[in-house]
Amino acid sequence: MGMSIKSKVLQKESPEAPFKVVEIERRDPREDDVVIDIKAAGICHSDIHTIQNEWGEAHFPLTVGHEIAGVVEAVGDKVTKFKVGDRVGVGCLVNSCGECEQCRNGQEQNCLNGNVGTYNSEDVDGTITQGGYAQKVVVNEGFVCTIPEGIDFDEAAPVSYTHLTLPTSDLV
């Protein structure tokens, strides 16, 4: 897609540091990616444990948030499921290899080559992913779900990650 994605995020420099609003540059979107303008993000216990480094291995500076709802702002040339203006949600994953047995069987959370978490994971470009307490996020289209009209973003965000456990990728 060849576009630079800048986003203000709510980030901590360390577990002890206060949250700060800073601007980051998201990775360049690829042809199978969706750029989302975030409208709401839920707060999950895992966000709290991670940002406080209670589970170890947190990579700082860090922006958490994996319950995301927003509007599609841009799509890559090979994106087929979404278009600009669609209402969408994102859960705890933003990518996987897509090729191993687990991924081919719809079990991307068990990717044998390492899935990419919404935050605190190594992304496809080698950077550490930053979560949804932000203005924008870049996600592989396979990890985006539709939010139907009539459901508020703040209601959809906390359940957006459930599309990984449901037999459908839509919140209907």
Report each predicted region and the residues it spans:
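Short structural boundary motif marking the start of a folded domain
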Residues: M3-V9
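Extracellular beta-rich ligand/substrate-recognition surface
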Residues: Q11-P18
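Glycine-rich beta-strand-centered segment in the early N-terminal region that forms part
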Residues: E25-A41, E54-R104, Q109, Q130, ...
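Cytochrome P450 core scaffold surrounding the K-helix E-X-X-R motif
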Residues: S46-I48
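Short Gly/aromatic-enriched secondary-structure transition segments
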Residues: T50-Q52
